C-alpha cells in the first residue's frame, strides 16, 4: 500500500506493495501465525494446535493436562488462582517487616547544638591548583562568638561531607572545637600552648551536594579534589605561622599533615585519598569517619563504585602487609564511628574496618558505647548531635600537638587517647592526655576513723549515703601473694577520677620507715595513725551510664564510675583506701571489694536449634563480685533479635536501692559494639555482628554476644535470666540488609515466567500473558525454586572459608591480623556475597521465606504494571478519537474492511472505493477500524527512526551516559506495549489476526517488565548526571559511554515498535533460548546482591539473542532493502567505484 506520499507499508506479517497489493497483503507468514478462535487465556477453547516453524513438529501442549484451570469470570479465576494467595502472603510479610522496622526503638538521645557560623571561601583556590575549581569549593569555618581572625594559624582539620551533604554540616564540630580551645586558653594559656594545643582550623569542602553514594567516578573526583586541597591548605600556614603574635613561632613549625573528618561517604573519600596519584606522602595521618560504609557500598548498582571500594580495601590491606619502611600507611590511624540501629541509610555493620586495618592502626566503635553519649544516633544526627560532638571534639583536641609538623601525637598515643575518649571515658574536667599519670597523695589515716577489711574476698563495702558514718576511711589490705583474688572493683555515682571528689579510691603504700604491713600496724596498739603514700590511678576508672529507679534510658542522665584494679598491678601497693571526705550528709552510694571471680566470661552453651525453639535460660549467684560476665556463642547474627527477661532474688530483709538498680552491658569484640540497658528487667537484645554479605574475618568468639550484669551483691542474692528469640523484631532487621535484592531478585522471577511463556509458545499454544506465566511458574516451579534456594544457602554457608585460626591467648593482635589478612585473599569463598549471604546454616529458612516474599511482590508489581498498561492503552484510544474520527467514517471503514476480508480481494483498494477513503480523516477512520494498520510505517518514517537511533547511540558514546538512552528506549517500549494492548482489544479483523495481536502484546509486555526491572539499577547514574548538568559541569562520564550496553535495547525496541512478533522457534533455538533465560535467572539469583549492575549486561546479552532470532527470519533484510539509500549504494559501487578501480 502506498499513501499519498508514496510510502510502501508493512503490516505485522503481511507485506504490502504497490503492484501486488492483493497477494502481498494476504501472504501468509507461518512463523507468525496461530489459528486461535478467541482471545488467549487459560480456557480450553483457547489452546490452539499450530505447528512450529522449525525442523521438528512438536505437539501442542494442553495446559489443562498440566494445570487444573478454574472456570468462571475474572473474580472467580482470581480467587481460585495460586498467584493471589502468594501475593497476599508476600504483602503480609512485607507489612510485618515494615511495621517491625518502624516499631524499633526510636529514642534519640541527642540534644541540639547551637552555633554562630561564619564561612570564609578561598577564591584563590582556582584552576591553578585543581581542575575541579568550577565544580567544588573550599571554605574555612569561623565561630564568631569566640574567633575574630579569618586567617588560619592553628591546626588544620578538613571536614568532608557525605552523599548529598552540605558543607555547612561542619558547623557543629567546628563551633565545639573553637569553644573547647577558647575555654582551655582562658583557663591556662601557657599550659595550653606548652601542651601544643592551638586553635583547631576547620576547613570544609563544598561538593555541591553531589550524590556520591550512587557513582564511583564522583567519588574519584572528590578524592582528587581533596588531595588538591590539602597542599593548598598546608601552604597557608607557612606565612600565617610567621606573622602570628599569639605564641612563640619557633615552637610550632608549619604543619605538614591534616586531620580528616568524614561523614558518611565523605569517609570513603577520605580513605581513598591515599590511593590517588596526586596524594602527597605524609599529608594525612589521622582519619575519623562518621557512619561511613567502609566494608560495602550501600547501593552497589554502579560497576565503578564497587570496583572503587575493592581497590581501596585492597590498597589498605596490602599496605599493612608490607614492612614499615615500605608501608605508606604505617603512621596512619583510622577511627570509624557507627551510629547503630537508628541509622537507616547505612547498615551499621558496614562501618567495620577490621578486614583491611590492623588493630594497631584502627579503632571502631558504636555511639551506643561512647561514654557520655550511650545512645544510637541516626545518620544525619551524627553531624549535629550535641552529646556526640562534645566527646568527638574532646578526642580530637587530645591528639593535637602543634609542636610537631604532623600536628598530632605519635600513633600509639593517638590510639590510646582516642580509646580513652571513645571507649573508657573520663570526667570532662579531666585532661585525658594526663590521665595515665597518677596523682600522688600522702595520707595520715586516723585509726579511730578507719575500718580495716579482711584480706579474703567476700567482705563488701556498701555505703548507701555519704557523710553519715563516723567511719571515714575503709582499708582493703592486699594479700601477698595475690593468687587468692582476681581484682579489686568498686562502683559509685561519685566522680572518683577527680582529686576533688568526696569519694576517693587510692592505691597506697605504707611508709617503709614505720611498717610494711597493715597487720603489723594493727598489732602495735601504740599506733593511732597510718601513714601511707597513695596514688589516684585515673586510668583504672571507666564511665558507665547511671542506672537508678528513675532512669529509663542510658543517655541524658548522670554517670556511674567503675574502678577496677587487676591483681597484676597490686604488687606495688599494700592496700586499697576508700575515703569518704563528705563534710555533710549527701546522697550517693559506694559498693566495692575484692573479687575472686574471673573477668573472663562464662560460656553459656546450647545448640542453635534449641536457641530458636526455647531460647536460653540460666541463673547465677551474685556472691563475690559486682559484675558477672557471660558469653553466648550462638548469638552473633545481626539479623536476629531477642528479648531478655531478668528476675531477681533478694536477701531476706533487703530492700532494693533507688540509687543503684541492676544494669546490663551487652557487647561484642568485632566489630566493637557496646550497649547498656539500665534499670534492667525486660528489654530487647540485638547485635551488629555477623551480617549478610559481609566478610567473616577473625575468630568466631570475637563476634559472639557477651552480657555483663552490674548489681549490688549486698542486696541481690540470685539472678534468673531468660533469653527468647523475637521473630517479629527480627523481621524489621531484614529490611536494611536485603533492600538491594528488591532490585535484582525480581529478574529471577520474570526470567522463569518468560521460560514458561516460550515453552507453551514453542509447543503450539498462544504466547501466555505475564499473569498466566506467573501462575504456571507458581504451580509448577515455586516448590522447586524454594527447595533450590534452601539447598544452595546451606551449601554456601558451609563452603565459605572463614579462615579461622587457633590463636593463643595473649598473642600479638597485629601479627594475628596479618595471618588472617594473608590467608583471606587466597580463598575464593572469602566473602559470602552469594545468594542471600547467609554465613550460618542455621538461618537457611530465611532463603525460602525471602524467595516466597519476592515472588509475591513480583506478582503484585506485575498486576500494577498491567493496570498501568491498560490505562495507557485507554489514553491511546482517546488520542485516536481526538485525531478527527467520526462515527460514520468508522462504520464505513469497518464495513469496507470486512468486505475485503470476506472476499479475500483488495482490488477495491486500488480503485474508487479506496479513493473515497483516501482523505486524511478517512485514513484515520480506517486505522481505527483496523487498528493493526497503526503499525504501518513508510520508508521516510523508517529512515527518520534510523537516523534518530544513530544520533542516540552517538550521544551515548560521547556526551550522555547510556542510561539516558536506555530511559528513552524504555519509554518507547512502554508506549509500544500500551499501543499493542489497545490494538489487540479493539481489533475488528478475524480471530486469527486478533490472536496474533494478543501474542505480540504479551511478548512486548514481558520485554517491558524486564526493562522496567533494570531501571533501578541504571537510574541512579542518571541522577548524578542530571545533578552535574544542573551545575553546568560539562565533563562527560567516561565510564558510562558503553555502546554494547545500549545497542541491543535500542534495536529490539525499534523492532517491536513495528509490531513484529518474534517467530516461533525450532527445537535448537528453543533450547538455546532456555539456556539464556536460566543464565539470567541464575546470575540474578546468585550474584544479584554482590554485582547487580551486571544484570543489565546479562539482559543485554539475551536481547542480542532475540535480535539474532529476528535477523534469522529476515527482518533486517526485508526492512533495510527498502531504504532508498541501498539501491543508490549498489549503483554507486557497480557503476562508479568498480569502474574507477578498473
From Swiss-Prot:
Single GO cellular component term: Golgi apparatus
EC numbers: 3.1.-.-
Signal sequence residues: none
Alphabetical list of PROSITE patterns matching this protein: LIPASE_SER (PS00120)
Active site: 264
UniProt-annotated stretches for the region Disordered: 24-59
GO terms, molecular function: phosphatidylinositol deacylase activity
Cell location: Endoplasmic reticulum membrane
Glycosylation sites: 596, 679, 1002, 1028, 1119
Transmembrane annotation, as ranges: 81-101, 741-761, 781-801, 849-869, 946-966, 1006-1026, 1035-1055, 1075-1095, 1097-1117
Function: Involved in inositol deacylation of GPI-anchored proteins which plays important roles in the quality control and ER-associated degradation of GPI-anchored proteins.
UniProt protein name: GPI inositol-deacylase
Amino acid at each position: 500500500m502506498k499513501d499519498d506520499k508514496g510510502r510502501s507499508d508493512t503490516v505485522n506479517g503481511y507485506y504490502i506493495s504497490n503492484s501486488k497489493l492483493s497477494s502481498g497483503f494476504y501472504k501468509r507468514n507461518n512463523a507468525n501465525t496461530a489459528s486461535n478462535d478467541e482471545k488467549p487465556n487459560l480456557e480450553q477453547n483457547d489452546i490452539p494446535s499450530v505447528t512450529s516453524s522449525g525442523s521438528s513438529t512438536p505437539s501442542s501442549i494442553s495446559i489443562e493436562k498440566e494445570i487444573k484451570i478454574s472456570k468462571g469470570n475474572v473474580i472467580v479465576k482470581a480467587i481460585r488462582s495460586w498467584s493471589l494467595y502468594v501475593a497476599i502472603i508476600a504483602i503480609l510479610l512485607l507489612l510485618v517487616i515494615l511495621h517491625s522496622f518502624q516499631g524499633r526503638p526510636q529514642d534519640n538521645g541527642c540534644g541540639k547544638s547551637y552555633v554562630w557560623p561564619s564561612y570564609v571561601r578561598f577564591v584563590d583556590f582556582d584552576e591553578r591548583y585543581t581542575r575541579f575549581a568550577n565544580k567544588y569549593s573550599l571554605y574555612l569555618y569561623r565561630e564568631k562568638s569566640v574567633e575574630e581572625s579569618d586567617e588560619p594559624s592553628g591546626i588544620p582539620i578538613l571536614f568532608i561531607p557525605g552523599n548529598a551533604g552540605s558543607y555547612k554540616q561542619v558547623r557543629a564540630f567546628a563551633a565545639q572545637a573553637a569553644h573547647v580551645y577558647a575555654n582551655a586558653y582562658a583557663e591556662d594559656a601557657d599550659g595550653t600552648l606548652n601542651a601544643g594545643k592551638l586553635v583547631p582550623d576547620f576547613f570544609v569542602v563544598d561538593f555541591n551536594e553531589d550524590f556520591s553514594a550512587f557513582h564511583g567516578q564522583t567519588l574519584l573526583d572528590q578524592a582528587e579534589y581533596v588531595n588538591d586541597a590539602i597542599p593548598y591548605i598546608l601552604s597557608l600556614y607557612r606565612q600565617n605561622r610567621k606573622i602570628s603574635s599569639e605564641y612563640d613561632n619557633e615552637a610550632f613549625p608549619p604543619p605538614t599533615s591534616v586531620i580528616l573528618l568524614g561523614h558518611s561517604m565523605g569517609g570513603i573519600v577520605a580513605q581513598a585519598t591515599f590511593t590517588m596519584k596526586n596524594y602527597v606522602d605524609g599529608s594525612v595521618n589521622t582519619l575519623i569517619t562518621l557512619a561511613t560504609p567502609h566494608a560495602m557500598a550501600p547501593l552497589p548498582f554502579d560497576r565503578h563504585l564497587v570496583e572503587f571500594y575493592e581497590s581501596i580495601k585492597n590498597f589498605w590491606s596490602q599496605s599493612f602487609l608490607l614492612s614499615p619502611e615500605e608501608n605508606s600507611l604505617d603512621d596512619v590511624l583510622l577511627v570509624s564511628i557507627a551510629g547503630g540501629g537508628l541509622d537507616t541509610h547505612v547498615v551499621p555493620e558496614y562501618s567495620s574496618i577490621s578486614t583491611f586495618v590492623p588493630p594497631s592502626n584502627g579503632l571502631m566503635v558504636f555511639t551506643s558505647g561512647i561514654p557520655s553519649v550511650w545512645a544510637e544516633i541516626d545518620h544525619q544526627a551524627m553531624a549535629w548531635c550535641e552529646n556526640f560532638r562534645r566527646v568527638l571534639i574532646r578526642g580530637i583536641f587530645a591528639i593535637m600537638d602543634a609542636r610537631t609538623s604532623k600536628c598530632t601525637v605519635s600513633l600509639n598515643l593517638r590510639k590510646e587517647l582516642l580509646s580513652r575518649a571513645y571507649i573508657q571515658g573520663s570526667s570532662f574536667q579531666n585532661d585525658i592526655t594526663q590521665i595515665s599519670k597518677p596523682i600522688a597523695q600522702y595520707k595520715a589515716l586516723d585509726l579511730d576513723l578507719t575500718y580495716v577489711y579482711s584480706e579474703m574476698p567476700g567482705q563488701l563495702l556498701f555505703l548507701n549515703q555519704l557523710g553519715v558514718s563516723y567511719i571515714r576511711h575503709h582499708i582493703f589490705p592486699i594479700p601477698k601473694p595475690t593468687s587468692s583474688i582476681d581484682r579489686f572493683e568498686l562502683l559509685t555515682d561519685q566522680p572518683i577520677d577527680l582529686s576533688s571528689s568526696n569519694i576517693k579510691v587510692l592505691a597506697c603504700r605504707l611508709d617503709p620507715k614505720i611498717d610494711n604491713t597493715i597487720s603489723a600496724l594493727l598489732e602495735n596498739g601504740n599506733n593511732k595513725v597510718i601513714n601511707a603514700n597513695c596514688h589516684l590511678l585515673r586510668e583504672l576508672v571507666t564511665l558507665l551510664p547511671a542506672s537508678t529507679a528513675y532512669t529509663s534510658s542510658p543517655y541524658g542522665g548522670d554517670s556511674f564510675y567503675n574502678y577496677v584494679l587487676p591483681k597484676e598491678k597490686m604488687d606495688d601497693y599494700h592496700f586499697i583506701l576508700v575515703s569518704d571526705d563528705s563534710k555533710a550528709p549527701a546522697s550517693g552510694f559506694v559498693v566495692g571489694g575484692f573479687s575472686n571471680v574471673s573477668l573472663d566470661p562464662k560460656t553459656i552453651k546450647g545448640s542453635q536449634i534449641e536457641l530458636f525453639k526455647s531460647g536460653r535460660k540460666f541463673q547465677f549467684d551474685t556472691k563475690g563480685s559486682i559484675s558477672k560476665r557471660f558469653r553466648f556463642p550462638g548469638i552473633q547474627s545481626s539479623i536476629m533479635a531477642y528479648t531478655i527477661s531478668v528476675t531477681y532474688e533478694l536477701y531476706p530483709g533487703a530492700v532494693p536501692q533507688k540509687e543503684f538498680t541492676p544494669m546490663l552491658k551487652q557487647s561484642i569484640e568485632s566489630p566493637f559494639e557496646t550497649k547498656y540497658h539500665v534499670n534492667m528487667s525486660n528489654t530487647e537484645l540485638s547485635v551488629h555482628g555477623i551480617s549478610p554479605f559481609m566478610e567473616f574475618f577473625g575468630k568466631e568468639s570475637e563476634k559472639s554476644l557477651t552480657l555483663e550484669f552490674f548489681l549490688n551483691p549486698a542486696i541481690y542474692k540470685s539472678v534468673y535470666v531468660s533469653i527468647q528469640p523475637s521473630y517479629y523484631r527480627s523481621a524489621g532487621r531484614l529490611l536494611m540488609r536485603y533492600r538491594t535484592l528488591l532490585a535484582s531478585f525480581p529478574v529471577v522471577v520474570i526470567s522463569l515466567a518468560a521460560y514458561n511463556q516460550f515453552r507453551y509458545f514453542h509447543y503450539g499454544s498462544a504466547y501466555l500473558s505475564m499473569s498466566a506465566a506467573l501462575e504456571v511458574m507458581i504451580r509448577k516451579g515455586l516448590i522447586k525454586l524454594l527447595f533450590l534456594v534452601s539447598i544452595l544457602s546451606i551449601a554456601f554457608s558451609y563452603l565459605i572459608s572463614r579462615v579461622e585460626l587457633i590463636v593463643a591467648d595473649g598473642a600479638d593482635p597485629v601479627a594475628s591480623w596479618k595471618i588472617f589478612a594473608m590467608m583471606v585473599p587466597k580463598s575464593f569463598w572469602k566473602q559470602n556475597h552469594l545468594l542471600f549471604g547467609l554465613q550460618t546454616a542455621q538461618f537457611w529458612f530465611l532463603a525460602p521465606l525471602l524467595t516466597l516474599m519476592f515472588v509475591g511482590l513480583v506478582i503484585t508489581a506485575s498486576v500494577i504494571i498491567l493496570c498501568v498498561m491498560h490505562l495507557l492503552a485507554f489514553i491511546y484510544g482517546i488520542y485516536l478519537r481526538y485525531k478527527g474520527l467520526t462515527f460514520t467514517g468508522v462504520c464505513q471503514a469497518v464495513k469496507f474492511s470486512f468486505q475485503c476480508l470476506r472476499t479475500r480481494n483488495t482490488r477495491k483498494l486500488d480503485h474508487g472505493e479506496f479513493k473515497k477513503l483516501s482523505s486524511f480523516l478517512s485514513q484515520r477512520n480506517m486505522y481505527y477500524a483496523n487498528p493493526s494498520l497503526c503499525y504501518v510505517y513508510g520508508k521516510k518514517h523508517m529512515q527518520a527512526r534510523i537516523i534518530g537511533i544513530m544520533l542516540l547511540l552517538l550521544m551515548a558514546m560521547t556526551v550522555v551516559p547510556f542510561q539516558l538512552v536506555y530511559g528513552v528506549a524504555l519509554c518507547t517500549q512502554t508506549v509500544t506495549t500500551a499501543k499493542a494492548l489497545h490494538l489487540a482489544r479493539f481489533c475488528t479483523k478475524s480471530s486469527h489476526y486478533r490472536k496474533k495481536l494478543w501474542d505480540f502484546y504479551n511478548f512486548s509486555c514481558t520485554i517491558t517488565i524486564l526493562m522496567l526491572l533494570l531501571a533501578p539499577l541504571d537510574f541512579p547514574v542518571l541522577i548524578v548526571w542530571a545533578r552535574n548538568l544542573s551545575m553546568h559541569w560539562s565533563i562527560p562520564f567516561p565510564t558510562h559511554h558503553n555502546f554494547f550496553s545500549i545497542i541491543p535495547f535500542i534495536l529490539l525496541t525499534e523492532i517491536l515498535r513495528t509490531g513484529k512478533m518474534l517467530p516461533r522457534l525450532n527445537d535448537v533455538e528453543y533450547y538455546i533460548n532456555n539456556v539464556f533465560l536460566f543464565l539470567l535467572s541464575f546470575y540474578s539469583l546468585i550474584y544479584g546482591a554482590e554485582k547487580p549492575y551486571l544484570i543489565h549486561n546479562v539482559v543485554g546479552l539475551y536481547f542480542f539473542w532475540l535480535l539474532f532470532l529476528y535477523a534469522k527470519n529476515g527482518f533486517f533484510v526485508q526492512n533495510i532493502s527498502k531504504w532508498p539509500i541501498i539501491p543508490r549504494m549498489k549503483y554507486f559501487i557497480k557503476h562508479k567505484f568498480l569502474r574507477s578501480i578498473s
